[in-house]
């Protein structure tokens, strides 16, 4: 039983590392590193912003983001 658990953890670790390597490979920006070689397309990871929804409503969207100085004190 312990061997099966260790095996499953090892398999999940290998799968996680493979996905990480694939994402790192495709997120490499060849234009900023070597502008003369553009043989492979690169993509930029999208940044998401919060939009008004039924749960948050538009009132929470107008609050400014806390600055780093008062990040932990904002409630």
Curated annotation (Swiss-Prot):
It is found in: Late endosome membrane; Lysosome membrane. Disruption phenotype: No visible phenotype. Mice were born at expected Mendelian ratio with no gross abnormalities. One of its GO terms (biological process) is cellular response to amino acid stimulus. One of its GO terms (cellular component) is late endosome membrane. Residues 1-3 are lumenal. Coiled coil: none annotated. It is a single-pass membrane protein. Expressed in the skeletal muscle. Negative regulator of amino acid sensing and mTORC1, a signaling complex promoting cell growth in response to growth factors, energy levels and amino acids. Negatively regulates mTORC1 activation by inhibiting recruitment of mTORC1 to lysosomes upon stimulation with amino acids: acts by promoting the formation of a tightly bound supercomplex composed of the lysosomal V-ATPase, Ragulator and Rag GTPases, preventing recruitment of mTORC1. Acts as a regulator of muscle regeneration following injury by regulating mTORC1 activation. This is Small regulatory polypeptide of amino acid response. It comes from Mus musculus (Mouse).
């Amino acid at each position: 039983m312990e061997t099966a658990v260790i095996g499953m953890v090892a398999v999940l670790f290998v799968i996680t590392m493979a996905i990480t390597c694939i994402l790192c490979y495709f997120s490499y920006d060849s234009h900023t590193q070597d502008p003369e070689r553009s043989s492979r397309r690169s993509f930029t990871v999208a940044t998401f912003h919060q939009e008004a929804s039924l749960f948050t409503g538009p009132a929470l969207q107008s609050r400014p983001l806390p600055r780093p100085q008062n990040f932990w004190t904002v409630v």
